A protein has these predicted regions:
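Conserved, mostly hydrophobic/aromatic
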Residues: 23, 61, 213
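A conserved hydrophobic secondary-structure block that centers on an alpha-helix together
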Residues: 30-33, 39-88
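Acidic/aromatic-lined carbohydrate-recognition and catalytic surfaces
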Residues: 73, 87-109, 116, 121
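Short, solvent-exposed loop/turn and secondary-structure capping segments
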Residues: 34-37, 69, 77-78, 97, ...
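Gly/Pro-rich turn-and-neighbor structural signature
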Residues: 2-7, 69-70, 76-79, 86-87, ...
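Metallocofactor- and cofactor-centric catalytic cores in central/energy metabolism, strongly enriched
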Residues: 59, 63, 98, 140-144
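Carbohydrate-recognition beta-sandwich/jelly-roll modules
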Residues: 1-5, 14-17, 84-88, 92
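Conserved small/polar residues in nucleotide/adenosyl-binding loops
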Residues: 238
Length: 238
């Protein structure tokens, strides 16, 4: 065949099979944090830095970011971070141990004021902390991480069990609905089955059907679990 003809018009490959595609900036200190200080003159990741990250994600055909969280607070360090991400079309979320659009450093920096990161003994303060996070992000497109791990990304206290996690997630959903003014299922949410959290799932802990289940590796690159046929049928999928 010597000739090839293409009919005039616009052609696309359709939407990506995976809705949220992006990066997690983890283990960022000292290399990335020192570079940002040198290149941008800040001790945190500000919107000038993150705008470059958003551009990178978009060039890679992505649309999603878990920001750096060892030393920085994406939302609190620079309020323009979230706004710039939203304007550029990048969806923001928080890591596996940072529920309800709050960065862990926001708690760590005020630990004496807030008290223990323990839902059994300090529920009122923690619920208030969660509420402030949802209130802050309700007007931008974010994916809310739900669930809870222990302080500093460790396991929860020994008195934690599936019933406690169920109560935490149930209360988080109520907070999301109250602060956004719409049903909880209309706000995208993700539950990370990381380390002992997957053990809770294997023991029967379940989340509402609309929640995305994020299956994690074992920190050594070995996938611990793949979604089964039933989990793929869920609205949130896995």
């Amino acid at each position: 065949q010597q000739n090839l003809a293409i009919e005039r018009g616009n052609y696309t490959a359709g939407e990506p099979a995976v809705k949220y595609r992006g990066l997690f900036f983890n283990d960022e200190a000292p290399c990335l944090t020192n570079w940002v200080k040198h290149a941008f003159g800040t001790n945190y990741g500000g919107h000038e830095f993150y705008a470059k990250c958003f551009e990178l994600i978009l060039r890679l055909r992505g649309n999603f970011l878990w920001p750096a969280m060892w030393c920085w607070t994406f939302y609190a360090d620079d309020p323009l971070n979230s706004k710039v991400g939203d304007e550029m079309g990048v969806v923001i979320s928080t890591s596996h141990h940072e529920p309800m659009a709050r960065n862990h450093q926001e708690w760590s920096r005020h630990r004496k004021e807030y008290g223990a990161w323990n839902y059994v003994t300090n529920q009122k303060i923690i619920d208030q902390f969660f509420s402030e996070g949802i209130r802050r992000m309700k007007d931008t497109e974010d994916v809310v991480t739900i669930g809870m791990r222990g302080d500093g990304d460790g396991p929860m206290s020994e008195d934690a069990d599936t019933k406690l996690l169920e109560r935490i997630i149930r209360n988080q959903r109520k907070i999301i609905a109250r602060e956004t003014g719409r049903p909880a299922e209309e706000t995208p949410q993700v539950w990370a089955l990381y380390k002992e959290v997957q053990d809770y799932y294997d023991k029967g802990l379940r989340v509402p059907d609309d929640v995305i289940m994020l299956l994690a590796d074992d920190n050594w690159g070995n996938v611990r679990r793949l979604p089964n046929a039933e989990e793929r049928k869920q609205i949130g999928r896995a």
